[in-house]
Amino acid sequence: MEKDQLKVRVLETGVMEADMAWLLLKPGRIIADRNNKERQREWGEIPTHAVLIEHPEGRILWDTGVPRDWSSRWQESGMDNYFPVKTESSSESGFLDSSLAQVGLEPADIDLLILSHLHLDHAGNARLFDNGKTKIVANRKELEGVQEIMGSHLGGHLKADFEGLKIDAIEGDTEIVPGVSVIDTPGHTWGTMSLQVDLPDDGTKIFTSDAVYLRDSFGPPAIGAAVVWNNLLWLESVEKLRRIQERTNAEMIFGHESEQTSQIRWAHQGHYQ
């Protein structure tokens, strides 16, 4: 494959705010909501992103970010109080549809949508791709896990985001197309996956999704978070990613690291290849 045939663009998909204890546990801390954020020392920004891959075999999108109507959609679960989206992201910029438009695309132009997992800030725009053209996939364990949800939501899973969508299952560490693979990294949820892209010029990139929230989460040592379904599996997944990173010298792009946003080459700035 010629090096100019594989391009990766990182798309802005909304910035949430929250008590950072959700993402990095520290002794003696409680978790605040937005009505009490002034009492906390670490109320911060939680950026989200999607990854657009231009490949000879088609256009691939990794994750979808937060929806424009987050306030109403998240209200029943209470997540609107704990993870409010920044006001600036309620404008025309900063959401998936506008980020796609910046590069001249719309949802129907995507051939394959890969959902790292089905939480509200990753699958929140999945219905944009219910268009008869885009194939949607997620990990089999994730698809089986959400079948256990009683009621409309469980933690960060909102059934309204994905219920009724045709989502095909993939399993384990899987090469999607040459140079693009998903890594099975459960723990955060039943079937959380990470994305590995091997680029001729810019090297290997690993997009961890929520398998690793932050640089401090990665360590070493790895530091846990409040939103983890299975702590042992989570730790095993972090160490699995560390082994891959050491073997490939990959750049790690973490799921919600605000300090990394200035280092990422966003789609409006260019692409990786």
Swiss-Prot record:
<feature type="binding site">
    <location>
        <position position="188"/>
    </location>
    <ligand>
        <name>Zn(2+) 1</name>
    </ligand>
</feature>
<feature type="binding site">
    <location>
        <position position="256"/>
    </location>
    <ligand>
        <name>Zn(2+) 2</name>
    </ligand>
</feature>
<dbReference type="Pfam" id="PF00753">
    <property type="entry name" value="Lactamase_B"/>
</dbReference>
<dbReference type="GO" id="GO:0102007">
    <property type="term" value="F:acyl-L-homoserine-lactone lactonohydrolase activity"/>
</dbReference>
<comment type="similarity">
    <text>Belongs to the metallo-beta-lactamase superfamily.</text>
</comment>
<feature type="binding site">
    <location>
        <position position="117"/>
    </location>
    <ligand>
        <name>Zn(2+) 1</name>
    </ligand>
</feature>
<feature type="binding site">
    <location>
        <position position="210"/>
    </location>
    <ligand>
        <name>Zn(2+) 1</name>
    </ligand>
</feature>
<dbReference type="GO" id="GO:0046872">
    <property type="term" value="F:metal ion binding"/>
</dbReference>
<feature type="binding site">
    <location>
        <position position="122"/>
    </location>
    <ligand>
        <name>Zn(2+) 2</name>
    </ligand>
</feature>
<dbReference type="InterPro" id="IPR036866">
    <property type="entry name" value="RibonucZ/Hydroxyglut_hydro"/>
</dbReference>
<feature type="binding site">
    <location>
        <position position="210"/>
    </location>
    <ligand>
        <name>Zn(2+) 2</name>
    </ligand>
</feature>
<keyword id="KW-0862">Zinc</keyword>
<dbReference type="InterPro" id="IPR001279">
    <property type="entry name" value="Metallo-B-lactamas"/>
</dbReference>
<keyword id="KW-0378">Hydrolase</keyword>
<comment type="function">
    <text>Hydrolyzes the acyl homoserine lactones N-hexanoyl-L-homoserine lactone, N-3-oxohexanoyl-L-homoserine lactone, N-octonoyl-L-homoserine lactone, N-decanoyl-L-homoserine lactone and N-3-oxododecanoyl-L-homoserine lactone.</text>
</comment>
<dbReference type="InterPro" id="IPR051013">
    <property type="entry name" value="MBL_superfamily_lactonases"/>
</dbReference>
<feature type="binding site">
    <location>
        <position position="121"/>
    </location>
    <ligand>
        <name>Zn(2+) 2</name>
    </ligand>
</feature>
<protein>
    <recommendedName>
        <fullName>N-acyl homoserine lactonase</fullName>
        <ecNumber>3.1.1.81</ecNumber>
    </recommendedName>
</protein>
<feature type="binding site">
    <location>
        <position position="119"/>
    </location>
    <ligand>
        <name>Zn(2+) 1</name>
    </ligand>
</feature>
<keyword id="KW-0479">Metal-binding</keyword>
